[in-house]
Design a protein with these regions (language model features):
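Long, intrinsically disordered, low-complexity segments
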Residues: 20-25, 40, 54, 78-80, ...
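An aromatic- and glycine-enriched ligand-binding surface/loop that stacks and positions planar moieties
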Residues: 22-85, 191-194, 210-363
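Conserved, well-structured interaction surfaces
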Residues: 43, 47-61, 65, 85-157, ...
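Flexible, polar/acidic helix-loop-strand segments at domain edges
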Residues: 92-99, 325-407
Length: 519
């Protein structure tokens, strides 16, 4: 994807053209553009359209300060927002302490980008004709991607407008569909896509960013799990597991490095590029052509106070510091391997790597004035690591190329364990649960729902799943108390769903706020 994604720029203006042509509100011919029905005739054109759907994932997850990764991660208890102070990036601080509103820009960005992806997928699905095997496959990819985009929406916002075609001028105002209707469409799209998708092994290495049969089956299993349809969820995950296409990578510490991208454990990733950006050519402001993962620079140890030593962890801009609670969770389980792969303490930075953090010399994180959000730990997992960027051409700060892992096999095994346990298949659940723990040398433990909850917290730390897990388990109100660095934020009933962005309500006269978020 990292090489091929540049071709997507050929498609960049097409979506607007498609809608304009579909509206048919001009009675004069428009010269220099293609009518909607004249596109996607060739396999090359269709590939450009499908790749444009994948491109939305880059834009959604790492567009400078507006990132779906941030929206999913910061409300959980894994990290603090951090930054220079409580006034640095207010939208981040609001996510951290539950003071966010329908005006929050990262939330708005996340909602908007999912509909950009849906719009692009709809163009492919509604216009392309599957008259060759390659076209049939690409239409299936678009359906699976549309299902993924809608799953992100329904799991975060609940009922949302269900748009399945390119809207005419009178159709932009659309009321919410129910969550049940959204899930029904997700399963319909996946059921139609799965028979026509290749296995992961049938893709060439450079094409493994694309939807595979196993990816779609995993999305299906996850959707059923969120619906609490446990036998159906277990069956979908079983299709992934018995395919023999995937396994656990042997070394957890290397899982989130560039060297492991699209590897043995990977089902679905957002691909990024090392592109030689410098301070003169980096494009801030949500430019959709950006190819790098700027998030990791935003979230590296704040360079004002930090020296690397031999740790390999480069300085950044100080957001997303791990909480002490997260470190304590690893310790409580005796989970040395994953702790060492995920976080680095200030004490170890000094004693093992010869680096330094020039404040809090006594390791007392309450010393005044404290570094905002800092409780003694840095992230190594998805960290600002020297191995993940280049300093020439360009500058190291702007060229992180680490992919975001959206679905990986350990997550599938833990979701399968949960679905099987709650469906009454205890021995199957035990096997999948134990397999994940074996990889990191943890002793055999009886599988229970509480044990799975703990295992997901540790295995999937900093991957953006914790907050939605707590919500679907009904644990968020009990766990997410005294949140934020000031310990003054609390999860409330309304936080079970993110707010519908104010801009969406303004632009769609039939849109209504989510419960508790205003009139």
């Amino acid at each position: 994807m990292k090489k091929l994604i540049y071709k997507i720029s050929l498609f960049a203006g097409l979506a607007t053209v498609l809608i304009s042509c579909a509206d048919d509100f001009l009675d004069k011919p428009v010269y220099g553009v293609l009518a909607a029905d004249d596109y996607f005739k060739t396999e090359e054109e269709l590939q450009e359209g499908v790749f444009a759907c994948y491109d939305v994932l880059q834009w959604a997850y790492t567009t400078d300060w507006n990132s779906m990764y941030v929206v999913k991660s910061f409300p959980a208890d894994e990290t603090h927002a951090g930054g220079g102070s409580d006034g640095d990036q207010p939208s981040y601080q609001q996510l951290d302490d539950f003071s966010y509103t329908a005006e929050n820009k990262p939330i708005e960005h996340s909602f908007k980008t999912m509909y950009f992806g849906i719009m692009r997928a709809n163009a492919v699905i509604n216009i392309a004709v599957g008259d060759t095997p390659a076209k049939v496959q690409m239409i299936a990819e678009a359906k699976a991607l549309r299902a993924f985009f809608y799953f992100e929406l329904v799991s975060m916002w609940g009922g949302v407008p269900l748009r399945l075609a390119l809207p005419g001028a009178s159709e932009f105002a659309l009321e919410k569909s129910t969550p049940e209707q959204i899930y029904a469409q997700i399963h319909k799209d996946l059921d139609e896509a799965i028979p026509n998708l290749p296995k992961k092994s049938e893709y060439s290495p450079e094409m493994r960013f694309r939807m595979s049969k196993g990816t779609a089956q995993a999305i299906k299993g996850k959707a059923y799990l969120y619906q609490k349809k446990y036998p159906e969820s277990a069956a979908a995950f079983e299709d992934v597991i018995t395919s023999t296409e995937y396994d656990l990578a042997p070394d957890y510490s290397k899982l989130f490095l560039k060297e492991s991208e699209y590897g043995l454990e990977s089902l679905f990733e957002v691909g990024y590029n090392i592109t030689g950006y410098d301070w003169g050519n980096f494009q801030w402001g949500g430019n959709r052509s950006m190819e790098n993962n700027i998030n990791w620079q935003l979230m590296g140890p704040r360079g004002d106070y930090y020296t690397t030593g031999t740790s390999g962890l480069l300085p950044g801009w100080g957001f997303n510091y791990p909480t002490a609670k997260m470190a304590q969770a690893f310790d409580a389980e005796g989970d040395v391997i994953r702790k060492n792969a995920c976080i680095l303490s200030v004490a170890d930075l000094r004693t093992k790597y010869g680096g330094d953090w020039i404040v809090d010399k006594n390791l007392d994180w309450t010393e005044a004035p404290p570094v905002w959000g800092m409780e003694g730990y840095f992230r190594l997992k998805y960290g600002s690591l020297k191995s993940e960027t280049v300093a020439s051409p360009g500058v190291a700060e702007l060229n992180y190329g680490t992919n975001i892992r959206l679905i990986r096999y350990a997550d599938v095994l833990l979701m399968a364990a949960e679905a099987n346990l709650l469906a009454g298949n205890v021995s199957t659940a035990q096997g999948y649960f134990t397999k994940v723990r074996d990889r990191v040398d943890l002793p055999v433990k009886t599988v229970t729902l509480d044990a799975i909850k703990t295992e997901r917290r540790l295995e999937l730390a900093f991957e953006g799943f914790r907050f939605l897990d707590l919500i679907r388990w009904g644990d968020a109100a009990a766990v997410l108390k005294n949140q934020g660095f000031k310990k003054n934020g609390n999860f409330a009933e309304k936080h079970n769903l993110y707010p519908i962005p104010s801009a969406e309500i303004l632009n769609n006269s039939k849109m209504t706020p989510n419960p508790g978020w205003g009139n």
